[in-house]
């Protein structure tokens, strides 16, 4: 075997020779690389390589050959094909071979080697290299011999007939061509950049603990027969070479145990020390101590023995105690010639082992920041293997020791970081498993807690684990019961800290205890009593943690119990050395339990690292417990909801007597109810007539027979729907009836049924009747502001979703399913129509859909049969029906508007009372005079644009548009009168919008004399005057209606005359008044000084006289003074 020289030029070290075959072939020199390239190019084995290259023997390991193959493949990908035609290998197919197999042919004069089978002198690895080389050469040959014309021809054939090419590949392609194609595809794939750190970490995690403890370059891991030989080779090296070789030995070691063993063995070789010990720094910044990682290690001590002995007898040395402790505290080296003469030396170990310590050299190990991470100590210098008690460590030994420990400090810190990363990796894997368990075991709290405790015990290596759960009263007691159980205390009462602690202690009562013992013991679940908890020391510690919310790490249980005045249970304290106890909290930072670890396996206290890991377990435990409890509570609430729905369904369903009565009633024709007219009104219908009218609509649409709806089921459903409407002022059952009638009129009179299927007509009528079920008299914004359960349940279109859910609830009630005869597909279709139609009554949805609908109309749409088009059309029809009261005759419209206003005003009162906010104008009772103006705005923004586009597209529904226009004129007229101060809104209904004179039948109406003072409108208000601060709508109506000349305007005179002379029913005037205007003088001096608080105005006084004729009989008695006051108020 050819030797590879060491970097220093000397013989190979035994450390290098003791490595495995995989680690022996590390990096190739330039010569080796050149050899690999020449071999890949076809140079036969045994050929003379280029200068500076190392020969590759025929007996090389397969690992090296694989590496060379890989290197050749990568270099071939990045190197252009050779252009030397004379030395090319040619790819030929021999005649008579049907499989198309090729063979390598070399030019004359070159040595040829058969490629079919390797020669007996060739190894399989060499044959594989040659086979790989042949394939690469064939690919290079193919790429150089093919002309561009051939490539274009093949490409054109492939593009024109790809199916034929695929068929040729699958049926007739030679195997070699397929393998070459596959190889070409593999070579074209991008290579992933190798990550040494990631590969090393994955190899480390995948290896067994036995493999992980082995050092690939460790002298101590060599066989017993090779140790003297290795030591002899190391002794042959000079000091510099030996130093560098031992540094390389520890440079890449990541296992902390193996690294420490290497350091002590190598230091013994460098300083001729008999044995050594290595201590690592642990603890917090305020309480640091040394832990003996390996103790009394000689050059012959095996790694396993050293680790076992250190684990069995863990030695802890505080900083500042003993020789090693002083070195760690002062960071100064200590060199002692005679140990027994030094007061810091502890001879107990010598007495115990029988070994005598003479010379000691102790030196600190620091990291790059200068912090102490360990202390190395060597004992008793030897001379060539012979121990002489008088020998001491000289300055040269100290310098060698210091230099070597500098490199060792880097290695130790790297190994510690790697150990931390491995620990974090394992912890993350466990936490991922815990997260998986939370989802898998969310319905079983016992299994979940048991899994968490098992993982915590195995990771933290403790003897026992316990979890205490606090009684939270989750969803068990009602609010009233909680108030009675815990009455409110006065806010000013002074509470002592002890009282507060006791109150918290009583509040955090443990109800469930989970205990997990040894490895093969099952978890124990119990419900301890109050007496059992009070007599247990472990329970008292858990109670303290639950009350304070603090983590407790107890090293001495007896001392802690004495300091905190807790009950001391002898049987528990005797078996307990260390306790780590931590609160378990939910998302609201409320303690829901306590997790407790008892006794680490090696008898040492729990460290801060243990507490950090255990904190993650506590968080996941809290998440799992909270999730499980929420799941259990959700199941209970769902069960309660089912019971409540059953009760609600029973009480929401119409009684059997009512159903039978309606079933037997005679249903009048549609004309008698005026169902075909857009001017339908329900004022004259009693409640039973409203139900009969609904039944008639279903009959006229032929829905009962078409969908085989049982008549008694339909009657019960109509009565149940009526029963589930609340008695609010507007959004009640009668509003639903009017909406359904308008839909019926649009379908029949408006001829919209020609665009709908029978199933869609059924869905639209059901949606109209159910679109405001269980309306509370408040809108969606109010539900959101008050954070009502409905707003939490439905984030958008709150009330509309609730209406649909109520509709579904009634349909699912026994004896109310009018869709029971439908097929599953028809049932899904009609329910989709009902849902979409009900949600479309939300004006927010109307504004979203309006633009798309207008776009369809502008594009001349006439079919309306697509799914999206039909949905838009149905949505616009639902909105048109929902606001159809605006198109009713005026005597109906203004009464309905007053009902709507009263319902809005009630909501405004609730906002003032509950939310302490100022409602908007339409809901503010104090601004009721603005109702006509707001009605005009509502018509202009929503109603008229909708009815106009529907009327243009479907001309048969023009009455809706015309009625809306007429009502807009009436509301505009009323708004102008209110603005001029000629009327006010203070009646129960707006049936008498203007106060009028009523003539008496038996009293002669005499002239009424009154004066009207007109102010000079040309006079500008002085700055700071009272009039300048008066709102415009609160100023005198006469002033607002005057012209600059002081006379009443023409529009005002016509409106005043109409109001005074015409009655509400449009009959002839009952009274005749003559209104005389006075001439207004404008001789006021604009520059005359006036008082800011008393503005001066001038004008002439005019007399107005009114003569009346005899009034008709039936008028009211009105005295003279009352008439005068009313007329003055009007003006």
From Swiss-Prot:
Q: Which domain of life is it from?
A: Eukaryota
What's the protein's topology in the membrane?
Lipid-anchor
Q: Cofactor binding mode, per the note?
A: Binds 2 divalent metal cations per subunit. Site 1 may preferentially bind zinc ions, while site 2 has a preference for magnesium and/or manganese ions.
Q: Which PROSITE patterns does the entry mention?
A: PDEASE_I_1 (PS00126), PDEASE_I_2 (PS51845)
Q: Name one Pfam family in it.
A: GAF
Map out region (Disordered) in residue numbers: 1-26, 42-150, 1019-1048, 1078-1131
Q: Which UniProt keywords apply?
A: Cell membrane, cGMP, Hydrolase, Lipoprotein, Membrane, Metal-binding, Methylation, Prenylation, Repeat
Q: Can you give the residue ranges of the GAF domain?
A: 255-412, 444-625
| UniProt propeptide residues | 1129-1131
Q: Name one GO biological process term.
A: signal transduction
Q: Name one GO molecular function term.
A: metal ion binding
Bias (Low complexity) = 42-63, 110-136, 1097-1117
General function of this protein: Has a role regulating cGMP transport in Malpighian tubule principal cells.
How is this protein named in the record?
cGMP-specific 3',5'-cyclic phosphodiesterase
Native species: Drosophila erecta (Fruit fly)
